[in-house]
Amino acid sequence: MLLQAKEISKTHGVRALFSKVSLRVDQGDRIGVIGPNGAGKSTLLKILAKQETPDTGEIIAPSAVSSVYIPQLDTFEDGASVMDAVIAVAPTHDANHLDQHTIAEISLSRVGFAQNQWDLPASTLSGGWRKRLSTACALSSCGNEPDLVLLDEPTNHLDLEGIAWLEDFLTLKMGGQAAYASIFVTHDRRFLSQVATRIVEISDAYPGGMLTVDGNYNEFIRRRAEFVDGQAKAAQSLANEVRKDDVWLSRGAQGRQTKQKKQIDASSQRKTELSEIRARNEAATQSGAKIEFSSTDRQTKKLIEAKGISKAFGDNKLFSNLDLALGVGDCVGLLGANGSGKTTLIKVLTGELAPDTGEIRNSDPLPRVVIFSQHREDFAPTTPLGEALCPISDRVEFRGRLMHVTSWARRFMFRDDQLTQPVSSLSGGELARVHIARIMLEAADVLVLDEPTNDLDIPTLELLEDSLTDFPGATILVTHDRTMLENLATRIVVLDGTGSQQICPSLDQAIRILNSNDSEQVESTDVPVEKTAKVRSNDGPKKLSYKDQRELDGIEDKIMAADEQVETAHSALSDPKVLANHELMTKACKVLDEAQAESARLYARWDELEAMKS
């Protein structure tokens, strides 16, 4: 056992962040901590790292256990070199009698710094290399031998190379197990899937305020759905019992005999339990912020077309001879290391910068472009939240309808009492929601999203994805959130930072190109790629093969059989014996999921065959 939290609680002002939370960390554990913004994840991490103290409960750790904490934001002294930053936190000598300089050299080598980088100013490093330097400082502070590493939002502002390095660093095997146990707060779903061996979600949706699942994020999603479904069924069953109690009580108890008193007490207890479980179910099904981007509803085939564009700054070539077209339904992802030219390409496409060669052709009238930038508009720290949301008056016009600032704020999960509070009191996620609220007020033909995921929690990320899927215009997306790129991008432009680029149909192919100088050639012409629920191929009608026609002839019978299986599975979940047995209920839920998936697959295949036939 490396660390144990026993029934710890913490409040912020009058609001309870979490109550009586318990957690145990053993060697080899890699624990991902998730939850909505404001749930207290970072506070919990600081308590585990002994940076803060809990209001109640205790943290137990053997004295021999060494742990290090890597905060979200780094702080290096002004003018410090890479080596200076690490030496500043290294012990004079470690257990092996190594001096500070040697300890620092080992730390820097371990995180990938070459010797010719040691004298670089820390202030000149990219986000990914600053994270490596923070990690080197943490390792150095304990003589390079931590048992436990705690990280707060470690992938924020990292490029894909930095994220890949961090994943390798945390999962590196030594002696058959991970080199370090780790606990990390993150909203990066792919990172959670690649690294975590256990997921902990802090939320009011669960008894005790926490749900723990062994396995990665994909396993967590499955188990969480089972839990929420089971809790909903439990509420229904309990509500039936309470109704029976009410009928019995309405008849009037004859006296107050011991047996009747017990029944009354049991009824009261059931009502309390029902109230609690309904509150948890409400928390579990909260939809979060209501994100809907507005479009001009223009159906122009091509909104922006780049023909042979190139751009360089001095000898630094960013892209050359690039052809790219943006039309309704397109979502083009831009991928490359920090400094490879993604932001510059956006500026050229949107007319803010002129290309060195080639031309940009726009639709007539010019497309309306709305930009969500990672370098977001700064509000004065004293600006009240209400003014930040509605800068002109106490009302906004959204899709032709006037809304009061109170209603508009609630749409983004802000409480009424927050409207008069300064924006300086908001968390990073709350500020991100303010900026989303601002750009939702502008109707767009083209949405440009430059790192929109920073500071957003997973529920808001998923809502943002849904809204972008439904947006009828074109989208340019710059993000290191691999899950979002995979779900949304119809094409991905890969910039290698040397003036070359390639257009890929999938994220996996784009990552392979980034990771290899000898990657296979990918066609660089601007060919739209089919993306489910986003765009359809513009190919002409296709004649069905004999095999496809046979499949189409028999698919309706298969669909009817699949729907009957779904109905049977639904009926099984209403069986009292199943509801009373967790194992049977889990199996029944799995059968239902599989039946629904098969039905959905057959309907999708039917649509596909009919489209090919027409």
Spans of model-derived segments:
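ABC ATP-binding cassette signature C-motif
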Residues: 1-233, 288, 293-614
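Intracellular alpha-helical coupling/juxtamembrane segments of multi-pass membrane proteins
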Residues: 223-256, 260-266, 270-281
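Short, surface-exposed loop/strand segments
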Residues: 285
